[in-house]
Amino acid sequence: MFTRTKLKFVASIFIIAIYLMVPVFAYDTEPSRASKQIMSYSMDVKSTGNGRIAIIFSVDGTGKMEHIGAERITVYQQVNGIWVYANSIDQNGSGMSANNTYYYGNTIYYNGISGEEYRVEVTIFAEDASGSDSRPKTFYEKA
């Protein structure tokens, strides 16, 4: 059978194997964020009926931002298979951005033609003393 020494050796190996099976999770000292200025963001485009399109965005800065919000929204309409410029609004337009705040979000509405296909390009941004950053996204929506 087993001698006392062999039994201790097998038990030690078994204990070491158990310790090796315990999961170890890495710890990151840096918080997860999109950039130095943008902590998180979201963008979406939805048809609300009767040709109206809701363009929804929000931006959460990593701190108090000098300027934060949507940098640009550009809308194209599909005409005979070709994307044709329909309208755009920049960061200085009504409801697009805010100054000296941590967060900004809003919904901008575009009045299109019911049943038509639209391409909407949305770019969010955040700007502070150390610089600025932006994130674009393109959506396709039937009004």
Question: Which role does the model predict for each range below?
Answer:
Residues 2-26:
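Sec-dependent N-terminal signal peptides of Gram-positive bacterial secreted proteins and lipoproteins
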Residues 25-143:
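Low-complexity, Ser/Thr/Pro-rich intrinsically disordered linker/stalk segments at domain junctions
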